[in-house]
Amino acid sequence: MRVKRGLASHRRHKKYLDAAKGFRGGRSKLYRTAREAVERSWMYAFRDRKVKKREFRKLWILRINAGARMHGLSYSKFMHGLTLAGISLNRKVLADLAVREKEDFAKLAQLAASKLN
């Protein structure tokens, strides 16, 4: 008896077409173009999960730098002062303090400045 493969290929095609839902034109309707678009989107997604970490770190450093400069310190001097003071807060928390809790950040900046001198 011959092997009929319609079910297997239909499932495989459906997997890609479901993943291409929301794409425009033939990219969501035609199997071959949908597969190419989906596989490319998976590559971009993989790459950008790494890029996202870099982007957030850059944003946090930018915010900490802005907060530190409001208190007369550069980013590097502020971070070095915190290290000398034995304060080990990560950049995400420091950036959040700089934006939302300005008084607490000012205290940290004052402490960092005192440890530098």
UniProtKB/Swiss-Prot annotation:
Sorted UniProt keywords: Ribonucleoprotein, Ribosomal protein, RNA-binding, rRNA-binding
NCBIfam families the UniProt entry points to: rplT_bact
Keyword rRNA-binding: yes
Example of a GO biological process term: translation
Superkingdom of the source species: Bacteria
Matches recorded under Pfam families: Ribosomal_L20
CDD domains found in the cross-reference section: Ribosomal_L20 (cd07026)
Free-text function comment from the UniProt entry: Binds directly to 23S ribosomal RNA and is necessary for the in vitro assembly process of the 50S ribosomal subunit. It is not involved in the protein synthesizing functions of that subunit.
Signal sequence bounds: none
InterPro entries, per database record: Ribosomal_bL20, RIBOSOMAL_L20_CS, Ribosomal_protein_bL20_C
Protein name, as recorded: Large ribosomal subunit protein bL20
UniProt-listed HAMAP family: Ribosomal_bL20
Family according to the record: Belongs to the bacterial ribosomal protein bL20 family.
